[in-house]
């Protein structure tokens, strides 16, 4: 009942003019903070994990945790495969109970990207699983995948329509100037390109690389059709910096139940801000 597909979440966001944040989790504490904060704010959220996260924690363990926490807080949650590339890996996780998938074949030529994505869509839709795919490429690093800034490609609006129609995807991740990781300086987002994509594609649009973006930029992308905002690095940085600071100030600390509280508090601030920026408080 409480573990849901992202399709309805994002369709509701599209109709309501807000975005749903997708938080990449890396450990139990991150998931606790995201779910507790979302439940307190009655905000829809997506629990996202890269292949590395699923390998680290175990698919069955993550599914069990999401299900248990959704029931505990009486709060609907979606668990989402972020930047997955291998069909067999996706199929295994879908059969285990995952109901939302991002197949990332954006590094392939256009026709091959379509072919790879359509194969995943055809399989996933048999299980009522929603599928996101990316057209264009973001710079930066996600898991073990590194894309140099010079190799990053913006989404072509006309191709985006062809891509969406040919694959049957449920949401489209676009490249408009964001990158994975934190920014050394404020990025310049191509809002006119995003507006053009919105005119050609009637699907919920997804923005990756949102860590460190200004509130103004995030809210402008939502006005232009973004329905899902991905955040990963900002959570990791908040966690690790707070933990380092605490252990520096308290070198005698040995109990993780104590010294992880400062890290959880720092992440809670990030999650609350992202939910506010997305305008999704009270929408769950």
Swiss-Prot record:
This is D-tagatose-1,6-bisphosphate aldolase subunit GatY. Zn(2+) binds at residues 83, 180, 208. Dihydroxyacetone phosphate binds at residues 181, 209-211, 230-233. Pfam families: F_bP_aldolase. InterPro entries: Aldolase_TIM, Class_II_FBP_aldolase, FBA_II, TagBP_ald_KbaY/GatY, TagBP_aldolase_GatY. Belongs to the class II fructose-bisphosphate aldolase family. TagBP aldolase GatY subfamily. One of its GO terms (molecular function) is tagatose-bisphosphate aldolase activity. The keyword Transcription regulation does not apply. It comes from the Bacteria. GO terms for biological process: D-tagatose 6-phosphate catabolic process; galactitol catabolic process. NCBIfam families: cbbA, PRK09195.1, PRK12737.1, tag_bisphos_ald. PANTHER family: D-TAGATOSE-1,6-BISPHOSPHATE ALDOLASE, D-TAGATOSE-1,6-BISPHOSPHATE ALDOLASE SUBUNIT GATY-RELATED. Its EC number is 4.1.2.40. Pathway: Carbohydrate metabolism; D-tagatose 6-phosphate degradation; D-glyceraldehyde 3-phosphate and glycerone phosphate from D-tagatose 6-phosphate: step 2/2. The lineage of its organism: Bacteria, Pseudomonadati, Pseudomonadota, Gammaproteobacteria, Enterobacterales. It catalyses: D-tagatofuranose 1,6-bisphosphate = D-glyceraldehyde 3-phosphate + dihydroxyacetone phosphate.
């Amino acid at each position: 009942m409480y573990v849901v597909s992202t399709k309805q979440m994002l369709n509701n966001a599209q109709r309501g003019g807000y975005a749903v944040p997708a938080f990449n989790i890396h450990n139990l504490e991150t998931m606790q903070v995201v779910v507790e904060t979302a439940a307190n704010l009655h905000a829809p959220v997506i629990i996202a994990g890269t292949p590395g996260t699923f390998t680290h924690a175990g698919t069955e363990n993550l599914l069990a945790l999401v299900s248990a926490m959704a029931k505990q807080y009486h709060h609907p949650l979606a668990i989402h495969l972020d930047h997955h590339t291998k069909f067999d890996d996706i199929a295994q996780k879908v059969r285990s109970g995952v109901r939302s998938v991002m197949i990332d074949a954006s590094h392939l030529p256009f026709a091959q990207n379509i072919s790879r994505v359509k194969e995943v869509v055809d399989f996933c839709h048999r299980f009522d699983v929603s599928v996101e795919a990316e057209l264009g490429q973001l710079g930066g690093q996600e898991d073990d995948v590194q894309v140099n800034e010079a190799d990053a490609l913006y989404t072509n609006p006309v191709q985006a329509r062809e891509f969406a129609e040919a694959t049957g995807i449920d949401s489209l991740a676009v490249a408009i100037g964001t990158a994975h990781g934190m920014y050394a300086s404020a990025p310049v987002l191509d809002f006119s390109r995003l507006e053009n994509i919105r005119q050609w594609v009637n699907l919920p649009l997804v923005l990756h690389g949102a860590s460190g973006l200004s509130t103004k930029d995030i809210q402008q992308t939502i006005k232009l059709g973004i329905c899902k905002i991905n955040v990963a690095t900002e959570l990791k940085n908040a966690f690790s910096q707070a933990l380092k600071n605490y252990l520096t100030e308290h070198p005698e600390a040995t109990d993780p139940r104590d010294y992880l509280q400062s890290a959880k508090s720092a992440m809670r601030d990030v999650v609350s801000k992202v939910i506010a920026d997305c305008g999704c408080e009270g929408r769950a």
